[in-house]
Amino acid sequence: MRLTYFDDAGLFNAQQEPFIVIGGVIVHADAQLIPLEEHIDRLIHEHIPEGDRTGFVFHAMELWHGGRYFDRENWPLQKRLEILADLAAIPAKFDIPVSFGYQKREHAWRFIDPAKLNTREVELQLYSDTYARFCESIEMFMREAASDEITVLIGEDNDAIHAVAKMAQQHYRDPNWVKETAPLLTYFPFERIRESVHFAKKSESKALQIADTCTFIIKRRLMNDPHIGPLYEALEPMMVVLLKPELLTEQSC
């Protein structure tokens, strides 16, 4: 059985975020989860002062920008990037697939009429579309590479998207809904993604911290951040997506 841990980036921040991204990691529950958790504990022990280790959670955005716990005064850029590199190396180290879906905000008019929706409704519709793209990549991987297994999705606990994600996944598993709404999509209805989507806090699930790292790096890559290259290159060999990873540039989106 696989557990797919995912997080989102760019939601509810239309002024500064040109993309909404949902990214995650597909973890073999029996073979990979415990070694993954133990490795994150080792990174906490290696990088974080003893008094701060209990319940510590890595956040990629804080590491990248130097905010909150990782403030720039106490955590120089070189050290923060070292920690980020250690986190980004985890998927390849443990042979854990990485996947994602994204939506570019300026293309939303193709399927959303902003005149009929308020700002929050537009954001949630964008999230729903992005979630479909992400789940489709997960379903593709499960059918093609792990066809004798199932996966359950576990997302970062965010009250704002609970209902949207649960309803979307219910639709994507319903043959009648798919037949009426999206009959030409190859990996719908879902067969290997089972149950409803579940949610947890990063403090409760160490694997979600890796989903956070992957999602942040992929978003920065989409934004053509000139400094994200080494971190993205660490993830790229583990990418399982419908879109070729080398097409991950702003111009191709």
PLM features per residue range, with description:
Residues 1-253:
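Phosphate-ester processing/binding pockets and catalytic centers
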